[in-house]
Structures are given as structure tokens and as C-alpha cells.
Amino acid sequence: MQVKRFFAADMRQAMKLVRDELGADAAIIGNRRIAGGVELTAALDYKLSALAPRVPNAELEEELRKTHTRIATAQAELDHRQDSSDNNRQLFAGQSLTAAEPLIEPHVDAPEAAAAPAPAAAPVDPRLFDAMRSELSGLRELLEVQLGSLAWSQLQGSKPQQANLWRRLQRIGLSGPIARELLDLTAEIEEPRQAWRMLLAHLARMIDIPEIEPIEEGGVIAMVGPAGMGKTTTLAKLAARYVLKYGAQNLALVSMDSFRIGAQEQLKTLGRILNVPVTYVDPGQSLAAALEPLLRKRVVLIDTAGLQASDPALRMQLETLAGRGIAAKNYLVLATTSQKQVLTAAYHSYKRCGLAGCILTKLDETASLGDVLSLAISHELPVAYLTDGPRIPDDLHLPRGHQLVSRAVNVQQQDEPSEEAMADMFADLYHNPRRAG
């Protein structure tokens, strides 16, 4: 029997390493979380004689589903216990906690006796909760990968036409839940080409696009997002678009980016070229006070700093934008060249300030639009603008759902997706279960 350990950043990558080196017959005999990722222990020619006879696929899938549900339930119970433990520490601070006394049936003839004090409950080490949560997370991720592989294999055998549509959606880069929703909408269509056309039409309708262009609606508009997404360039395109259409007298620019070298100089140059006033807001300075002299302007465009999620200044910036008296419409600027994890992290970091929508940049450089479209659809983020080049303002466009979908199809992967990629797509379905209702 050949036994080997594999290290990777996440469970899916670890499973791929196992498959590549030991093949599909390898058995996973251990897994644990480590610093920087996961560790899998896999074996080849693992003796299974002590185990129960092989279960048919349908039954195996059902058991895996039950186990997946149990893990989710255990995770919820763990969270509940930790919350209860925290609440008890707050409610009984300064008091000694005792274990509950056993229930004693009343007996009239028995003489009353003073109950002996119960021993104090031992404090729970928070590290125990962390270890349990980490182990549960690893088990859940492993199950998701296995369930995804099993579900994909069964679909290929039972519904080859639908499996082909899944492959085409995976080439676009759409997430598993979005693909499933699209296929549910076209389940009754048997002709493959018609089904594909309807899938794309439904996808176009899923993309939320504002009825009124943001700069036409007016008000305070802020560009938010991580560094490198194209916030300042997008702001320059919006400002030039407005000036060319309405003139410079009702436009003002504001910079909250005092962290990046040369950021304020860029905006100062833009203001000079467009003949538009530029206001600079330093950290800790009141944004409301800075905006007060600009209240008569029809449009105020704000450029913000692209800060890391761990930077304390980011929280201050988001709280400022979400503060009373600001009424800013915050648009998350997302580079379509970014990886899925980067896009997801950006959304979760910046949603705290309240997002009015998103602006998709660098469409001319991207190799896939699936990840960013999946994010916008799943989080109901309206797509306000698109940019696809360096020209100001010529490379700024209003989105159209069918044009975005057409572009996504045009830049899709040329090669057929691997079996591992399809299994990962199905694993995403278990990681993001269908919502009730």
C-alpha cells in the first residue's frame, strides 16, 4: 500500500494533486487544516475488506447528502454554543457559575435537607471551538468535492444533453448556482440550439442594469474598491463624459485618497484640464463638511483609496461614506481581469458602506466575464458602466444585458473543461445550496 501526504491551499487543489499523482483509485484516509491550507493523506491499494460492501451510486449519494447535512447542523450548533457561552460570560460576570442540579421528584415524608453546592463549571477554552470549527470546515469541503464529482458523473450518464449545456456554461465561467438556475428555466426545451439561445437570453435578463444613468440622476457618486481596479481612471472618464455633455459648471471632484503617491496629483491634473474644482479630504476630516460648499453642484464624483481589508483606515473610510448627511451612491469598481477570490473579497470588504451597484473595468484585457457576472447577479448588484480601454471618455460605455452576454461568449475558454473543473462546478452547488422559496 502506497501512502502519501499532499499539501495545498484548499481542499479542491489538494484533491487535484491526489488525482494527478495517485489516480482516481486513491483513497483519502486523513485530512486536517494546517497553516496556509490543508493536508490530505491518501493511499493507493488501500484495503477495504473491513468496510461494508460497495453501495450503489444512488444510495451513496444519499448518504453523502445526509452527512453533509449533519456537518452543517453541527456547525450551526457549534456556533450556537459559542454564542451561548459568550452570553453567559456577560450575564454572569463576577458570579461563580455552577452546574445544574439533577431533577428530584418531590417526596412529602422526606425531611428537608440543604443541597450540597455543585462544583463550578470548567471554563471552555476558545481554542477548542476554533479547532472543532476548522475540522468541520475541512470535512465539509472534502464532502463538497466528492459530492460534486459524483453528481457530475451521474448527470453525464443520465442526461448527456444537459451535461453538454453545463460544459458550455462552465466555459463562460459562470458559477454553479447561476448555471443551475439557468438550466432550471430551460429544462423543458429539448432542442439543443434552442435551449442554448434561451439560456443566454435568460442570462441577459438576470443582469440588473439601472434604468437611469448615474451621472444623469446626479448627486454624490463615489468610486470604491481595492487598489488596481481602475477607480481613478473610471472617475476621469465619468467626469469627461459629463463635461462634454453638460459643461463643467455643475461638476465637482473630491479625493479621499491620501495614501497613494501621486493620487491627488492625478485628480488635480484632471480638474485643471476639465476646469472643474477639486477638493481634498484627509483621513479624519469630515466628508460632510467638505461636501457642504459643493451642495449646489449637480454631480460630485469622489475618488477613494484602495485599501486592504486588514487596513484600519478602510473601516474609517467606509464609515465616512456611509455616514449621515452624505447620501453618497457608492459604486464598487471591479476589474474583470481579477480572479474569483479577489472579486468576492472586494464585495465583502466594501458592502459595508452600502453599494448602489458596480462598474466593470478592463473588459478589453479579460479572458473571462463569468466570475464577475456571477458575482453581480448573485448579490443583485446593478451594472452601471463598462470600460474597455484607456481612452477618456470614449472607452466608457453604458451596459446592455445581451451585449455583455455576447461578449462573455466571445471571450470564453476555447478548450473543453476538464472533468476536475466540472466536478468543482458541481461542488459549488453544495457550497451554495439552493435557497428555500
UniProtKB/Swiss-Prot annotation:
Query: Which InterPro entries does the record cross-reference, listed alphabetically?
Result: AAA+_ATPase, FlhF, FlhF__GTPase_dom, P-loop_NTPase, SRP54_GTPase_dom
Alphabetic keyword roster: Bacterial flagellum biogenesis, Bacterial flagellum protein export, Cell membrane, GTP-binding, Membrane, Nucleotide-binding, Protein transport, Transport
Where in the cell?
Answer: Cell membrane
Per the UniProt entry, what are the Gene Ontology biological process annotations, in alphabetical order?
bacterial-type flagellum organization; protein transport; SRP-dependent cotranslational protein targeting to membrane
What's an example GO cellular component term for this entry?
plasma membrane
What is this protein's record name? Flagellar biosynthesis protein FlhF
Q: What is its main location?
A: membrane
The lineage is: Bacteria, Pseudomonadati, Pseudomonadota, Gammaproteobacteria, Pseudomonadales
Q: What does this protein do?
A: Necessary for flagellar biosynthesis. May be involved in translocation of the flagellum.
Binding residues for GTP? 225-232, 303-307, 361-364
The UniProt entry's sequence similarity note says:
Belongs to the GTP-binding SRP family.
What the entry lists under NCBIfam families is as follows:
FlhF (TIGR03499)
- Membrane topology, record value: Peripheral membrane protein
The residue range of the signal peptide is none
Superkingdom of source: Bacteria
Q: Which molecular function term from Gene Ontology is one that the record holds?
A: GTP binding
